[in-house]
Amino acid sequence: MTSKKLVNSVAGCADDALAGLVACNPNLQLLQGHRVALRSDLDSLKGRVALLSGGGSGHEPAHAGFIGKGMLTGVIAGAVFTSPAVGSILAAIRAVAQAGTVGTLLIVKNYTGDRLNFGLAREQARAEGIPVEMVVIGDDSAFTVLKKAGRRGLCGTVLIHKVAGALAEAGVGLEEIAKQVNVVAKAMGTLGVSLSSCSVPGSKPTFELSADEVELGLGIHGEAGVRRIKMATADEIVKLMLDHMTNTTNASHVPVQPGSSVVMMVNNLGGLSFLELGIIADATVRSLEGRGVKIARALVGTFMSALEMPGISLTLLLVDEPLLKLIDAETTAAAWPNVAAVSITGRKRSRVAPAEPQEAPDSTAAGGSASKRMALVLERVCSTLLGLEEHLNALDRAAGDGDCGTTHSRAARAIQEWLKEGPPPASPAQLLSKLSVLLLEKMGGSSGALYGLFLTAAAQPLKAKTSLPAWSAAMDAGLEAMQKYGKAAPGDRTMLDSLWAAGQELQAWKSPGADLLQVLTKAVKSAEAAAEATKNMEAGAGRASYISSARLEQPDPGAVAAAAILRAILEVLQS
């Protein structure tokens, strides 16, 4: 079965892709009648060397993404994974020659079709009197024994574009550029690994891998690698790759040693997530520095892909200061990353976090009667939530991911562990603030954030007073914060429904002579009734709002949990 691709037609996909790049980049132009993209300011290159590269499409952003001042002059593209036509290569050479350039360097990846077609175009151009040189780049470090065809051209070719581009921009001559980039090419290596294959538009995947296998040492055309290995962690795979690339018994190894300075390139082969790319980059930095290698520059991104292949390649280039200046030279190429000219190794990568604000001393003695009462309340709340874990999870399965009970139990266990460390603060404001921090760190999910918001806001009115009116104001402040940031309102089938109903009853605490337990009892009953009523509501906020109301036949688990917490508080205060 062929894979799905967002194309207009299989036959025209390479042309459409190149046209799209040029349409969105005013620095590029198409060469009419050919699958060629050129700098739009060719006239500015008079008296300088032009740089042309290319190959099959499907490796984007290579190579057209690297056209620009300080990199390539133009690119000739073939169909997907197919070498470009000789006629188009020759047309590109003629176009840059007519613009007044003093010679053209062809930068070619080491594949038979590319060598033949670029080589033939070069000979035809030279027969016309156009000075043309060609460098063939092979940076593949997969094969331990060199084959007659030589090393394949991989992502390291992009570094050659950069070095050659900087030299050309500086006015260096054609033969000297060719000489220097040939030296640079011998100081680098690339190795790829993939979780699965890719598929050319209109075709099936090029190879199959089982679920527990990855392909090591594969090329950029979907061809199989040198061996298959068992799936492992990112750290383990990176170590294996670097071991292979630097093993001196490997005929295509990179001669990296402790003390070596390198440019490190982590390349997405097309289908890897940015999350995985970051993990691989971190693993590569740690592994190289653990070997005593200095990372002068780190390039992480998609440079040379293989369509949608979910894999990466690692490239190492040995550098000295003169070569590093060429890597750092300015370029306008759209796909080249804007990397700071600063060494990665030796750089301070973290800063000390700001200290927590100093708390005022607890106004009531820790371990006193008020503190003990606080501990009893918290213990009852925790045991209540732990007892409700499975019930809340069952309620949550209808509208969420079935973890509401687990989330509340995680909070309960965190509070229990905290209580083992010593008596809680007797100051209500300090207690709520500490609980807020604890729940934000340990509870997780939206519930942790909402309870954290509620408690942080509720603590503020209690800093100056702890009277019943202050507690009512604390409830108001907590509810306001939940509504402001959670975007829920009463009637939206959330925990706010229970808390809001209780908050309305607690307004009575603001009246002179109000009785704590009488008012709180009414508040708890209202919260429980509101929680039960949520089963008849259509969700207006949270994950449940994306679920059909026909499936919401049970009370909202968050509302049930909030009412249960209030009931637990009341029971302790009544005892």
Swiss-Prot record:
Name the record gives this protein: Triokinase/FMN cyclase
Entry coiled-coil feature ranges: none
Organism of origin: Homo sapiens (Human)
Free-text activity regulation comment from the record: Each activity is inhibited by the substrate(s) of the other.
Cellular component terms (Gene Ontology): cytosol; extracellular exosome; nucleus
Quaternary assembly: Homodimer. Interacts with IFIH1 (via the CARD domains), the interaction is inhibited by viral infection.
Catalytic activities: dihydroxyacetone + ATP = dihydroxyacetone phosphate + ADP + H(+); D-glyceraldehyde + ATP = D-glyceraldehyde 3-phosphate + ADP + H(+); FAD = riboflavin cyclic-4',5'-phosphate + AMP + H(+)
Encoding gene, per UniProt annotation: TKFC
Tissue and organ expression note: Detected in erythrocytes (at protein level).
Cofactors (names): Mg(2+); Mn(2+); Co(2+)
GO biological process, alphabetically ordered: carbohydrate metabolic process; carbohydrate phosphorylation; fructose catabolic process to hydroxyacetone phosphate and glyceraldehyde-3-phosphate; glycerol catabolic process; negative regulation of MDA-5 signaling pathway; regulation of innate immune response
Positions carrying Phosphoserine: S350, S511, S545
List of catalytic residues: H221 (tele-hemiaminal-histidine intermediate)
